[in-house]
Amino acid sequence: MSSTKKPLVLTILDGYGHREEQQDNAILNAKTPVMDVLWQQQPHTLIAASGLDVGLPDGQMGNSEVGHVNLGAGRIVYQDLTRLDKEIKDGDFFTNPTLTAAVDNAVKTGKAVHIMGLLSAGGVHSHEDHIMAMVELAAKRGATAIYLHAFLDGRDTPPRSAESSLKRFTAKFAELGNGRIASIIGRYYAMDRDNRWDRVQLAYDLLTQAKGEFTADNAVAGLQAAYARGENDEFVKPTVIQATGEADAAMNEGDTLIFMNFRADRVRQITRTFVNADFDGFKRDKVVNFGDFIMLTEYAADIKVACAYPPASLTNTFGEWLMKHDKTQLRISETEKYAHVTFFYNGGVEEPFKGEDRILINSPKVATYDLQPEMSSAELTEKLVSAIGSGKYDVIICNYPNGDMVGHTGDYDAAVKAVETLDNCIEQVVAAVKAADGQLLITADHGNAEQMRDPATGQAHTAHTSLPVPLIYVGNKAVKAVEGGKLSDIAPTMLSLMEMEIPQEMTGKPLFIVE
């Protein structure tokens, strides 16, 4: 018979951010005697839950999916765009072993470096800043033939906005005294994802054979001719860019090709056209045996070419680490946030880990939650308190959705009610944890209810915020709080409170030091 467990409980108050100003602040203006006393008397700190601290672009508000991924991973989990921006800013991009080896190989064998991708500042499939960094990397490492094959956007950017990008790269090549834009084509052809192989073939022939419907001396002239034909960026027909006397930029055996899109769905088809021996979408007039073909990120597991930035593997998330150490865990929330404390918290793993139980409480069936700001918190608290006292679990992770779901309605009075309801719930949870001689962490995944009106417009503020969130410790250990934390520090904090080893994959730091 196993001994009764003293659980460590993580309570996530969704949308419960920290803001000092009282105006339009449903959290500060609500009557919260329990949270007030905890904040005054218990070890506590504020932690970052937005922007680069959670792997989002700088200044971007946090969200529940990203928040829970970071909470469970114990490390910052970067989106591809942010990860690449950061790599370039820190200089690590320029020493990426896959990219540098591919360029060095071309330099050594006297071959061309072809760079292709969506030349756009849209940031959805690619970013031209990444392409610029790649051009600079190739030039710095001594590549003498650098050819940029520009796919034009007009979907994630205005329909006719490519000219500034083409001018920027034309100027860069002039400054380098080396390389050029070799072709332009609309994404409608190069980035099809619906097996319209007639479109892809036009792009493939342009790239491999320098064969296009149109030719121009320079990229801007080629674009202006397309506009004159009535083609917007997305639909620019295959155009070879080649001034009189210039060698063509067809792709040849031994050349290096680097594909600079980071989003996979619209690059799989054309990539397979290049690399699959058994490709049968259309008859390829020319099959190029590249020295190196590099995809920037992994476009598909079955595309067997080198990848500069493989997916960040989320091994040893908090839940998986508990399983490996034979610990029991419970995940509990209402419908609205159930996926967050399970799938997202587990780093995108759907199946529960061994020893992981789950309890789903149905959220109330109302049109909007301002009509029932307490949501299903009474039932959720009852089940949570029962689980804490059951002695079954080493760890319990619970999400209360009220602050976020009611915050999204923009109804200030309802948000105040939601926060006051939560205070009553926390009172019961604290009592249960103390009775079980356990430990409790109270935090949030991002802010919302602390800012219910937009000061700039005077309208209801229904979105998340970029503000920090509280972290409070209640328990049987004497601990000292550390400042400057973020969501990815919570999992290591929990492991240290349980006196467990922290896996090396977790780069977060414990925020409560046992004295």
UniProtKB/Swiss-Prot annotation:
<feature type="active site" description="Phosphoserine intermediate">
    <location>
        <position position="64"/>
    </location>
</feature>
<comment type="similarity">
    <text>Belongs to the BPG-independent phosphoglycerate mutase family.</text>
</comment>
<feature type="binding site">
    <location>
        <position position="404"/>
    </location>
    <ligand>
        <name>Mn(2+) 1</name>
    </ligand>
</feature>
<feature type="binding site">
    <location>
        <position position="445"/>
    </location>
    <ligand>
        <name>Mn(2+) 2</name>
    </ligand>
</feature>
<feature type="binding site">
    <location>
        <position position="64"/>
    </location>
    <ligand>
        <name>Mn(2+) 2</name>
    </ligand>
</feature>
<feature type="binding site">
    <location>
        <position position="193"/>
    </location>
    <ligand>
        <name>substrate</name>
    </ligand>
</feature>
<protein>
    <recommendedName>
        <fullName>2,3-bisphosphoglycerate-independent phosphoglycerate mutase</fullName>
        <ecNumber>5.4.2.12</ecNumber>
    </recommendedName>
</protein>
<dbReference type="InterPro" id="IPR006124">
    <property type="entry name" value="Metalloenzyme"/>
</dbReference>
<feature type="binding site">
    <location>
        <position position="408"/>
    </location>
    <ligand>
        <name>Mn(2+) 1</name>
    </ligand>
</feature>
<dbReference type="GO" id="GO:0004619">
    <property type="term" value="F:phosphoglycerate mutase activity"/>
</dbReference>
<feature type="binding site">
    <location>
        <begin position="155"/>
        <end position="156"/>
    </location>
    <ligand>
        <name>substrate</name>
    </ligand>
</feature>
<dbReference type="Pfam" id="PF06415">
    <property type="entry name" value="iPGM_N"/>
</dbReference>
<dbReference type="InterPro" id="IPR036646">
    <property type="entry name" value="PGAM_B_sf"/>
</dbReference>
<feature type="binding site">
    <location>
        <position position="337"/>
    </location>
    <ligand>
        <name>substrate</name>
    </ligand>
</feature>
<feature type="binding site">
    <location>
        <position position="446"/>
    </location>
    <ligand>
        <name>Mn(2+) 2</name>
    </ligand>
</feature>
<dbReference type="InterPro" id="IPR005995">
    <property type="entry name" value="Pgm_bpd_ind"/>
</dbReference>
<dbReference type="InterPro" id="IPR011258">
    <property type="entry name" value="BPG-indep_PGM_N"/>
</dbReference>
<dbReference type="GO" id="GO:0005829">
    <property type="term" value="C:cytosol"/>
</dbReference>
<feature type="binding site">
    <location>
        <position position="14"/>
    </location>
    <ligand>
        <name>Mn(2+) 2</name>
    </ligand>
</feature>
<keyword id="KW-0324">Glycolysis</keyword>
<comment type="function">
    <text>Catalyzes the interconversion of 2-phosphoglycerate and 3-phosphoglycerate.</text>
</comment>
<keyword id="KW-0464">Manganese</keyword>
<dbReference type="InterPro" id="IPR017850">
    <property type="entry name" value="Alkaline_phosphatase_core_sf"/>
</dbReference>
<feature type="binding site">
    <location>
        <position position="187"/>
    </location>
    <ligand>
        <name>substrate</name>
    </ligand>
</feature>
<feature type="binding site">
    <location>
        <position position="125"/>
    </location>
    <ligand>
        <name>substrate</name>
    </ligand>
</feature>
<comment type="subunit">
    <text>Monomer.</text>
</comment>
<dbReference type="GO" id="GO:0006096">
    <property type="term" value="P:glycolytic process"/>
</dbReference>
<feature type="binding site">
    <location>
        <begin position="263"/>
        <end position="266"/>
    </location>
    <ligand>
        <name>substrate</name>
    </ligand>
</feature>
<comment type="pathway">
    <text>Carbohydrate degradation; glycolysis; pyruvate from D-glyceraldehyde 3-phosphate: step 3/5.</text>
</comment>
<dbReference type="GO" id="GO:0030145">
    <property type="term" value="F:manganese ion binding"/>
</dbReference>
<feature type="binding site">
    <location>
        <position position="464"/>
    </location>
    <ligand>
        <name>Mn(2+) 1</name>
    </ligand>
</feature>
<keyword id="KW-0413">Isomerase</keyword>
<keyword id="KW-0479">Metal-binding</keyword>
<dbReference type="GO" id="GO:0006007">
    <property type="term" value="P:glucose catabolic process"/>
</dbReference>
<dbReference type="Pfam" id="PF01676">
    <property type="entry name" value="Metalloenzyme"/>
</dbReference>
